[in-house]
Amino acid sequence: MTDKVKAVPDGFHTVTPHLTVRDARRALEFYQKAFGAEVLHVAPAPDGKVMHAMLKIGDSFLMLNDEFPEMGGDPAPSANGGSGVTLHIYLENVDAAFARAVSAGASVKMPLMDMFWGDRYGTVADPFGHKWSLATHTRDMSPEEMEREQEKAFAKMPKSA
């Protein structure tokens, strides 16, 4: 009798991001430097491009590959001016991680700041067109506390037309 294979393999979460990039080998180096990623597997295509790569950042997996338009694959976000998707990472020390990401080549989209929802938070764009938000949770709050803090924060914001 055969054991049933798990639908979600050990170590995976239900949702796993899979990124398409231009120059996946350079992206692998960037994610290692910027986010401390561990490269678990790289499957090269016959032409040397990366068909599939598996990385681990903290307790989560990230998959990526080079563009393969000749196989009907999607273009990298850098081909279209960016992506509407943001990947979020919780870290023990967001200040150090943010500095590492910028040092590795990320551009700052929103500088780090203490947010009304209890996180120290900022956003960067990687050199491959993907956006990342980085945070350290600094304060647990009840829904009522968060609502009060949100009202205070929004009261300070400029009004849109």
Regions found by a protein language model. Give the residues of each.
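Short acidic-aromatic low-complexity motifs
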Residues: 21-25
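Vicinal oxygen chelate
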Residues: 1-18, 28-29, 35-125, 135-161
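C-terminal catalytic core of tyrosine-transesterase DNA break-rejoin enzymes
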Residues: 128
